[in-house]
UniProtKB/Swiss-Prot annotation:
Organism: Schizosaccharomyces pombe (strain 972 / ATCC 24843)
Highest taxon in the source lineage: Eukaryota
Keywords of this entry: Membrane, Mitochondrion, Transmembrane, Transmembrane helix
Primary location recorded for the protein, binned into one broad class: mitochondrion
Name of the protein described by the UniProt record: Uncharacterized membrane protein P22H7.04
Residues passing through the membrane, by range: 99-119, 146-166
Annotated localization: Mitochondrion membrane
A GO cellular component annotation in the UniProt record: mitochondrion
Membrane topology value: Multi-pass membrane protein
InterPro entries: TMEM70/TMEM186/TMEM223 (IPR045325)
């Protein structure tokens, strides 16, 4: 019954508005008031169903928001990053194909040299009786080759371990978290934009500092308190607001 009454009211409003439009169609004053009459009709019909009028958004507001974000200073972006309640991405590394290919090539060569040196060391160990028996009769270069192989083998394995350790100190992304914290993701970014050896660290903001005195240097060096060694950050990555100064505003520097 109530629905029928609502329908009757809507029909009456529509009939009244159509009568006003038909009688005042050729009145110039009424033509200027037609947008007002149209908005009044929408509001009156919506009030019948106890619904609020629909707000209309203009593209000008959207353009203002976009231009305000583009014109935002690093200090404003840093303030937004430190006051947000959600993770805010400040930096993300780009895939540098040259560095990645050189890194992979170096690792492959070291593995190959380590394998060859290991087999050579095994042969020397098996023939040690003959070698040491003739040690006095060997010349200087032969002795130097045996001594050098004894030092090169552990040095190669140490170098390989160091190269595999570097991705743990290579920063992939930095994000701000609530309660004045950072989420630092480390890893090796391949030429195909795949992250290997990734690890996530959540540390307080006060424990992170930039050691590099200039952002024009590459890589940028970061230090985390109570953690050994330094962390490296590729300066050619993506920054919030497309400005490197955001790092100094968010992290800060300590020489």
């Amino acid at each position: 019954m109530s629905m029928l009454i609502f329908n009757i009211r809507v029909a009456r409003h529509k009939a009244l508005l159509s009568r006003i439009v038909s009688t005042n169609m050729f009145n110039p004053m009424f033509r200027s008031l037609r947008p007002i009459q149209k908005s009044f009709s929408e509001i009156s019909i919506l009030r019948v169903f106890n619904k609020p009028p629909i707000k209309k958004f203009h593209n000008s507001n959207i353009l203002k928001d976009i231009t305000s974000k583009r014109n935002a200073t690093p200090a404003k972006i840093a303030w937004q990053a430190m006051t947000t309640r959600e993770p805010f991405l400040v930096y993300q590394a780009k895939a540098d194909k040259k560095i990645s290919l050189i890194y992979l090539l170096t690792v492959g060569m070291l593995i190959n040299v380590c394998v060859i040196t290991s087999f050579a060391s095994v042969d020397i160990y098996r023939a040690k009786d003959e070698i040491f028996a003739n040690w006095v009769d060997m010349d200087y270069y032969e002795k130097l080759s045996y001594i050098g192989s004894a030092f090169i083998t552990p040095a190669l394995y140490f170098t390989l371990t160091l190269i595999l350790f570097l991705p743990r100190r290579n920063i992939y992304s930095i994000s701000t978290l609530p309660s004045q914290r950072f989420e630092i993701v480390t890893g090796f970014l391949s030429p195909f934009n795949k992250l290997y050896f990734s690890k996530s660290l959540i540390v307080p903001r006060k424990d992170v500092s930039i050691v590099t005195y200039s952002l024009q240097k590459n890589p940028i060096t970061l230090k985390i308190r109570d953690r050994p060694f330094y962390y490296l950050l590729n300066a050619n990555g993506k920054y919030a607001g497309n400005s490197k100064d955001v790092l100094f505003c968010v992290i800060g520097n300590r020489y």
